[in-house]
């Protein structure tokens, strides 16, 4: 896909991977709309990237339909690429599990992601093409201690990705999951303060590069899943 002039919606675009991906895509000539919960942060990203913005909490399930209409209006009623990046985390051992923590994570990572995608699919079907990028995690490949809530939410995203691939390929809609390993960001940080880069760890730039590369592949092909690891994070 040639990105010049393409309309792209990125959820969770006010920080981290979403912010850097917006920068990559705008620099390629795309029309990018980012969502987030903080007007202040969105305005800062607008200055950094040149992307449009809208205050939109993906976890507010009841408002997704109306907010999707607002997004479409800001993108001339056409979305070429949806990047489901918004996400949150929670670390709990099995004896600490509770329904409130599950709902907090699943409302964003699974339910909000699914309902937003459902709302946008008719627009892509009308065009008979489109690309959906789901941001997963290497936690969707293997569980870990304390990962019951977060890892299971990303396993769910992986299942959704595979189901949508089977359903949407006949409409020329590509669905790809990008699984970053650890990236120091504001993710799971209550204060939502960006973390400093750590030597030998991935940065948001590597993930933004992977996402952009997956989108730019010619439309006749697609990458079904892309795992991104740091080469040598152990030093």
Residue ranges and their predicted role:
Residues 93-94, 101-103:
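Substrate-binding pocket helix/loop in short-chain dehydrogenase/reductase
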Residues 137:
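Residue(s) in the substrate-gating loop at a strand-loop-helix junction
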Residues 142, 163-173:
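Active-site-adjacent segment of SDR/Rossmann-fold oxidoreductases
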Residues 170-173, 177-178, 195-235:
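C-terminal helical subdomain
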Residues 14-15:
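Conserved glycine-rich cofactor-binding loop
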Residues 55-67, 99:
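The beta1-alpha1 cofactor-binding region of Rossmann-like NAD(H)/NADP(H)-dependent oxidoreductases
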Residues 117, 153:
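Active-site helix of classical SDR
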